[in-house]
Curated annotation (Swiss-Prot):
Keywords from the UniProt entry: ATP-binding, DNA damage, DNA repair, Nucleotide-binding
PANTHER family: DNA REPAIR PROTEIN RECN
GO cellular component: bacterial nucleoid
UniProt source species: Xylella fastidiosa (strain 9a5c)
Purpose of the protein: May be involved in recombinational repair of damaged DNA.
Family matches, as InterPro entries: DNA_recomb/repair_RecN, P-loop_NTPase, Rad50/SbcC_AAA, RecF/RecN/SMC_N
SUPFAM superfamilies: P-loop containing nucleoside triphosphate hydrolases (SSF52540)
Full protein name: DNA repair protein RecN
GO terms (BP aspect): DNA recombination; double-strand break repair; SOS response
C-alpha cells in the first residue's frame, strides 16, 4: 500500500508531501490545477521514460519519491529479496529527472535501472487511464488475472512442471547430438585399444618383467660375485672363512674345560659354521640358475621399450597402461550406447510431451470456464458504468508452435466492444482514456477478492459521464476501495463523495509564477469542495445542501 509520496520541482509543483491510507482516496480541483500530476509522478516512479519538460521552470531537477508498505509474503517483497534490494517492511522508490534530460532511480536507497523500477512497480501499483503504463494492457498480465480468477494454481503448477521436464530432456538430447557423429572417434580409440591390447599390461607381470630385466642385465656380475663369495667362504687356502672358523673352534676345544663360559663361544662358532654352510648351498643354487642368454635379454628389452613408448604416448607410467586401456574401452562402449540412449531420450521426450498436453488441457478447461464467467460479469458492469451495449470478450489463442509452454497451450487477449454494433478490439487499442479507465474498473470490480496489485490508480474514469452513471462509478470505486487502496482523480461530485479520503489541488500564484498546492480536506472543507464541483465558483445554498446530501448518503450506505 502506498503510504507516502513526495513531489519536488515537478511541472508546476514546488514541494508537496502526501500521506495515504487504505480505502478510496479522491483528488479533485479546478481545471488546470494539476490534479493528474500525482498520477504522472507515480507513473515516472513506475519506470516511465521522462524528459526535461517535467522539471519545474527554473529548477535544476525534479525529485520524486514514494514509500510503500508491503508484507513479508507480498510479490514485491519476493522480487526485492531475489535481487537483494529488500529492506525491513517498507519499499522506497526514488527518481530524479534533471533539467539536462538525465535521469536516475533508486530502490531502498540503492541505484537501479528504469527496467528494474518498472519490474518492481508492476507488483505495487496499477495505473488505469494512461496507455503507456497500464499493466492490464499486457497480454501476460491479462493471463495472470484470468488464472487468478479461475483459481487454477494446481493446474498451472502441473503445466509448468511438465514443461520444465520436457525442456530438460530436450536439452539433454541436444547436448548429446551436439557431440556429432561418433564413428570417427570410435574408430580412432579402437585403433589405440588394439595397440594396447597387443601387450600384457597386467601390473604384476610388468613388475616381474622389470625384475627379470635387471637380473639378465647383470648376470655376469652376479656370477662373478657368487664365485668370489664362495671362494672367500670356503676356498682351498687356509684363509677362507670356513677354514678359519674350524681352526678357532679347534683351539677353544682344548681349553674349554677350564672355563665354562668358553662353551658358549663354541656354540656360537658352531652356529656360524652352519650358517656359512647354508650360505654356500644357496650361492651354489643361485650360481647354477644364472645363465647368460643374450637373446632372452634382447627380447625383454624390446618388450620394455614398447611399454615405455606406450606410456609416453598416453602420458602415464607403464604400470598405469592397463587403467588407461580400460578407460578407453569404457568410452567406446559409452559411445556405442549413445544411439540407444538417444532413442530412449526420444521416447521420454514423447512421454513428457503427452503429460504436458494432458496438464495443459485441464488448464485450458479452467481458463475457458473462467473466461466466460469473467466476460459476463465484466460486460454487465461495463453497461452499468454507462457504456451501453459494450461487451468484453476474453479470447484464448493457441500458441503458434506446439512446443510445451510453461504458461499452457494458449495466450489471452481481452477484446472490448465499447458501442453496439462495433467489432471487438484488443483492450490495448482503445483510444479513449476514459473508456479504458471504466473498462479497467469493471474488470477490477469483477475480480474483487483476488490477490492483485494492492494500489490502483484511476485517471479520467469519469470522463464523458454524469448523473446516475457517475454515482454508479463512484459506488464501484468505493467497493474496490474496501479491498484495495484506490486513488482516483475526478471532476465529478458523485465520485468525489464516495471517497474515504479527499485531497484538493489548487493553483497558487507565488512571485508571479503559478504553482500547484494540495491539501487534505476535513469534513467541512470536503462539503465545500463538493459544493464547488456541483455549482461552480459561486457556491449556492442549494449546491451546499446537495453536497451535504451526497456525503450523508455515503454514511447511510
Amino acid at each position: 500500500m502506498l503510504r507516502h509520496l513526495t513531489i519536488k520541482d515537478f511541472a508546476v509543483v514546488r514541494n508537496i508531501e502526501l500521506e495515504f491510507g487504505p480505502g478510496m482516496t479522491v483528488v479533485s480541483g479546478e481545471t488546470g490545477a494539476g490534479k493528474s500530476l500525482i498520477i504522472d509522478a507515480l507513473g515516472f516512479l513506475s519506470g516511465l521514460r521522462a524528459d526535461s519538460s517535467v522539471v519545474r521552470h527554473g529548477a535544476e531537477r525534479a525529485e520524486l519519491s514514494a514509500e510503500f508498505n508491503i508484507t513479508i509474503h507480498h510479490p514485491a517483497r519476493v522480487w526485492l529479496r531475489n535481487v537483494e534490494l529488500d529492506d525491513a517492511d517498507q519499499c522506497q522508490l526514488r527518481r530524479i529527472i534533471r533539467a539536462d534530460g538525465g535521469s536516475r532511480a533508486w530502490i531502498n536507497a540503492r541505484p537501479v535501472t528504469l527496467s528494474q523500477l518498472s519490474d518492481l512497480a508492476t507488483h505495487l501499483v496499477e495505473i488505469h487511464g494512461q496507455h503507456e503504463h497500464q499493466t492490464l494492457l499486457s497480454r501476460q498480465s491479462q493471463l495472470v488475472l484470468l488464472d487468478a480468477y479461475a483459481q487454477n494454481e494446481t493446474e498451472r503448477d502441473a503445466v509448468q512442471q511438465a514443461a520444465a521436464h520436457w525442456q530438460a530432456l530436450l536439452d539433454e538430447r541436444d547436448a548429446l547430438q551436439a557431440q556429432g557423429d561418433m564413428s570417427e572417434r570410435i574408430n580412432f580409440i579402437e585403433h589405440q585399444l588394439t595397440e594396447l591390447q597387443r601387450e600384457n599390461l597386467d601390473p604384476a607381470t610388468i613388475t616381474a618383467l622389470d625384475a627379470s630385466h635387471r637380473r639378465q642385465a647383470h648376470t655376469a656380475a652376479l656370477i662373478e660375485a657368487c664365485k668370489n663369495t664362495t671362494q672367500t667362504l670356503n676356498g682351498d687356502d687356509t684363509t677362507s672363512a670356513l677354514h678359519l672358523l674350524h681352526a678357532a673352534r679347534h683351539t677353544l676345544s682344548r681349553v674349554t674345560e677350564h672355563d665354562a663360559r668358553l662353551g658358549e663361544v663354541e656354540t656360537l662358532l658352531d652356529n656360524a659354521m652352519i650358517q656359512v654352510d647354508e650360505a654356500l648351498t644357496l650361492l651354489d643354487r643361485i650360481h647354477n640358475d644364472l645363465n647368460i642368454d643374450p637373446e632372452q635379454l634382447e627380447a625383454i628389452e624390446l618388450r620394455i621399450g614398447r611399454l615405455h613408448s606406450l606410456a609416453r604416448k598416453y602420458r602415464c607410467t607403464p604400470l598405469d597402461l592397463a587403467a588407461q586401456r580400460d578407460r578407453m574401452a569404457a568410452e567406446v562402449e559409452s559411445m556405442r550406447n549413445m544411439d540407444i540412449h538417444l532413442q530412449q531420450l526420444d521416447h521420454r521426450i514423447s512421454n513428457a510431451m503427452t503429460k504436458w498436453r494432458q496438464a495443459a488441457e485441464k488448464l485450458s478447461i479452467s481458463r475457458t470456464r473462467a473466461a466466460a464467467a469473467l466476460s459476463t460479469t465484466t460486460t454487465n458492469l461495463i453497461n452499468e458504468l454507462g457504456m451501453g451495449g459494450g461487451q468484453l470478450l476474453i479470447q484464448l489463442q493457441p500458441h503458434e508452435n506446439n512446443r510445451p509452454h510453461p504458461n499452457g497451450a494458449e495466450r489471452t487477449e481481452f477484446l472490448i466492444a465499447t458501442n453496439p454494433g462495433q467489432p471487438p478490439r484488443p483492450l490495448r487499442k482503445i483510444a479513449s482514456g476514459g473508456e479504458l479507465s471504466r473498462v479497467s474498473l469493471a474488470i477490477m470490480v469483477a475480480a474483487l477478492g483476488l490477490d492483485t496489485v494492492p494500489t490502483m490508480v484511476f485517471d479520467e474514469v469519469d470522463t464523458g459521464i454524469g448523473g446516475a452513471i457517475a454515482d454508479i462509478v463512484g459506488q464501484k470505486l468505493r467497493a474496490l476501495g474496501e479491498q484495495h487502496q484506490v486513488l482516483c482523480v475526478t471532476h465529478l461530485p458523485q465520485v468525489a463523495a464516495k471517497g474515504h479520503t479527499h485531497y484538493r489541488v489548487s493553483k497558487i500564484p507565488i512571485d508571479g509564477i503559478t504553482q500547484s498546492a494540495i491539501c487534505l480536506l476535513d469534513s467541512q472543507e470536503r462539503q465545500e469542495e463538493i459544493a464547488r464541483m456541483l455549482g461552480g465558483v459561486h457556491i449556492s445554498k442549494e449546491a451546499h445542501a446537495a453536497a451535504g446530501k451526497l456525503l450523508q448518503e455515503l454514511q447511510e450506505m
